[in-house]
Each structure stands twice: as C-alpha cells, then as structure tokens.
C-alpha cells in the first residue's frame, strides 16, 4: 500500500463492530472516513436473524428487498482518493446489503479497493470477490475478516501487512 496515497475508509456497521475497526484503520493510516447509512436505519429488532419476521430475515428471503436505499452514495471529494477500504459485517455468509447497494452505484475507476469484514463466527467466504463482481470497476484486493472483538493490535498488524 502506498503510504502517500490519499485513502478513505467506507463502512457500514449495524452494531458498531465494523465501525470500531473502520475507525482504527482510519486513525492508523490518516484516512478520511465515510459511513454508509440506510435511509431506514436497522434497529436491534431488525437485526434479529433468528426471528423469521425480522427485517434482515425478510430481506434474506426476498432478494428484491436487498436493494437498500441509502442516505447518500456520493462520497465527498471522491476523485482525490487512490485507496478505498470498504468495511462491512457478514450477513448470511456475504456482505451486508447496504454495502452491496453502494458498491453497485459507485464508479471506483482505477482506485485500489481493500475490503474488510467483521463477524462473530463466519469467515470472509467469497464476500470480497462477490463485491468485486457487483462493482463496475476498481482494482480489488483480497479481503480480510476480523472477529467482532478484534484488538487494535490485530488491526495494526493487518495494515502493516498490506
């Protein structure tokens, strides 16, 4: 990773786990940060994946509900960034739908895209390559999975490995 390249960390976080990692990454590389925000925010009840009537369960079972309307898909000063970190929680083995919605709408051009995810128990799976397939452009790098309680040291070690 070019330490002189201007970077941004873009993330969606339903329960602050991904936000914590995103904030740590941004602080360590002096990057800007942009939160992906659905117009209709997810509540704790919405996120109850064991409840077949919860919002995420309905969205999981009906893909037509997975195109989430976002407050903004326009990242300020987008053209200035060379490197983009994209963070998301894992939902049903893939990236959270608000991230998918953003990735489908943004032109990444020749930017370097570095995905990262958080999960209590699921792995990265193919979420990084699935996002690449949904994007129209970008130089996508392999993703990295953090546990939801990853330490600052784990984040710093990963950044150093890039």
Regions found by a protein language model. Give the residues of each.
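Short beta-strand elements in bilobed, periplasmic/extracellular small-molecule ligand-binding domains
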Residues: 33, 136-145
């Amino acid at each position: 990773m070019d330490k002189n390249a201007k970077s941004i960390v873009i993330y969606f976080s339903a329960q602050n786990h991904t936000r914590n990692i995103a904030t740590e990454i941004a602080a360590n590389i002096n990057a800007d940060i942009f939160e992906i925000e659905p117009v209709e925010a997810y509540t704790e009840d919405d996120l109850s994946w064991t409840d077949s009537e919860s919002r995420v369960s309905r969205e999981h079972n009906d893909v037509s509900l997975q195109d989430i309307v976002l407050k903004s898909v326009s990242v300020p000063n987008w053209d200035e960034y060379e490197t983009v970190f994209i963070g998301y929680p894992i939902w049903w083995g893939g990236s959270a739908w608000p991230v998918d919605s953003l990735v489908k709408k943004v032109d990444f051009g020749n930017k370097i895209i570095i995905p990262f995810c958080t999960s209590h128990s699921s792995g990265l799976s193919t979420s990084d390559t699935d996002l690449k397939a949904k994007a129209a452009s970008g130089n996508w790098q392999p993703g990295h999975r953090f546990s939801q309680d990853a330490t600052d040291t784990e984040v710093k070690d990963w950044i150093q490995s890039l």
